Curated annotation (Swiss-Prot):
Subunit structure: Homodimer.
Family matches, as CDD domains: TrmD-like
Functional summary from the UniProt entry: Specifically methylates guanosine-37 in various tRNAs.
Region of interest called Disordered, as start-end residue ranges on this chain: 245-279
Gene Ontology, cellular component aspect: cytosol
Matching SUPFAM superfamilies: alpha/beta knot
A Pfam family recorded for this sequence: tRNA_m1G_MT
Name assigned to this protein: tRNA (guanine-N(1)-)-methyltransferase
C-alpha cells in the first residue's frame, strides 16, 4: 500500500480529493492511504501561529522551520519510513508522468504544502526532493498536492478498473493520447471515423497510433524524440510532412522499405507459342 502524507495549513482543501471518486474508493479498498497533517497542531503557542516576518524585511510571512520539522517528525512516526519528503515550490523539478510513475513505486510519500511566502529556507534540509507543476505561482501547495495525488494514485495496481488504461494515456506512451469517440455515431454533421466501427482491431490500433502521432506533431513536437518511434511511425510522420532530415534529428528509424511485387513466372503453357494458323 502507498501512503500519502500531506503537511498543510488547510487540510480541508485536500479532504474532498482524498474521500471522493476513484481516490476515495481506493482508500476504502486499502489500496492507498491518505493522511492530512495540520501544521497548526505543531505550533506550540497559544494562538497556533506557524509563521513569522522574514529576516531582512519584505512583504508576507514565512512558515517556521521548527513547526515544519515537528509536523514532519509526527508524520514519520505515524507511518512507515518515508521514501521521499517532497516540497512543492516553483523552483523545484518539473512534475511529469515519468516522475509520477517513479513515485507510484514507493511506499510512503510525505508532501510539504506551503502558503504565504513559503517555508523558511532551512526546510530544504528536511526534504529529499522539490517539485513544481510548472512555471507559475499559486497561493499554496494544496492544489499541486491534489494533482500529484491523482496522478500517482491512479498508477497503483488495482486503483483503476482497467489495468491497461493508464498505459494508453498521454505521455505514458511518449505521445499525446489519440481522440476517443462514443455514441451517437452522428452528431450535428460530425461522424465517428469508419475505421473505429469496422471491427478490424489491427486497423484500429494503427489509426490510433497515427492519430497520436499527428496530434503530438501538431501540439507537442518536443515529445517525439523520446517517444520510441517505430519504422511504421516514421512512415506515418513522413506522410504528415515531416522531412527525412527531421526524422534523423529525432533518431527515428527509417521507414519500412516498399514492398516490391515479384512478377509471376510464366508457366509452360504461357511459354508455348500460340497457333494462329487456320485449318
Amino acid at each position: 500500500m502507498l501512503t500519502f502524507s500531506f503537511l498543510t495549513l488547510f487540510p480541508e482543501l485536500l479532504t474532498p480529493f482524498a474521500q471522493e471518486a476513484i481516490v476515495g474508493k481506493a482508500r476504502e479498498r486499502g489500496l492507498i492511504d491518505v493522511r492530512l497533517v495540520n501544521l497548526r497542531d505543531y505550533a506550540q503557542n497559544k494562538h497556533l501561529k506557524v509563521d513569522d516576518t522574514p529576516y531582512g524585511g519584505g512583504a508576507g510571512m514565512v512558515i517556521r522551520v521548527d513547526v515544519a520539522a515537528r509536523a514532519l517528525d509526527a508524520a514519520c512516526q505515524a507511518g512507515p519510513r518515508p521514501d521521499e519528503v517532497i516540497l512543492f515550490t516553483p523552483a523545484g523539478e518539473r512534475f511529469t508522468q515519468q516522475v509520477a510513475e517513479e513515485l507510484a513505486n514507493k511506499q510512503h510519500l510525505v508532501f510539504l504544502c506551503g502558503r504565504y511566502e513559503g517555508f523558511d529556507a532551512r526546510v530544504e534540509g528536511l526534504v529529499t526532493r522539490e517539485l513544481s507543476l510548472g512555471d507559475f505561482v499559486m497561493m499554496g501547495g494544496e492544489a499541486a498536492a491534489a494533482c500529484v495525488l491523482e496522478a500517482v494514485a491512479r498508477l497503483r495496481p488495482g486503483v483503476l478498473g482497467d489495468e491497461a488504461s493508464h498505459q494508453q494515456d498521454s505521455f505514458s506512451s511518449g505521445l499525446l493520447d489519440y481522440p476517443e469517440y462514443t455514441r451517437p455515431p452522428e452528431w450535428e454533421g460530425h461522424s465517428v471515423p469508419d475505421v473505429l466501427r469496422g471491427g478490424n482491431h489491427a486497423a484500429v490500433a494503427r489509426w490510433r497510433r497515427d492519430q497520436a502521432l499527428e496530434r503530438t506533431l501538431r501540439r507537442r513536437p518536443d515529445l517525439l524524440p523520446g517517444a520510441g518511434l517505430t519504422p511504421q511511425d516514421s512512415a506515418a510522420l513522413l506522410a504528415l510532412g515531416v522531412t527525412p532530415e527531421q526524422l534523423s534529428i529525432w533518431d527515428a528509424p527509417p521507414p519500412p522499405a516498399p514492398k516490391v511485387r515479384r512478377k509471376k513466372k510464366p508457366s509452360a503453357e504461357d511459354k508455348a507459342p500460340t497457333d494462329t494458323s487456320s485449318e
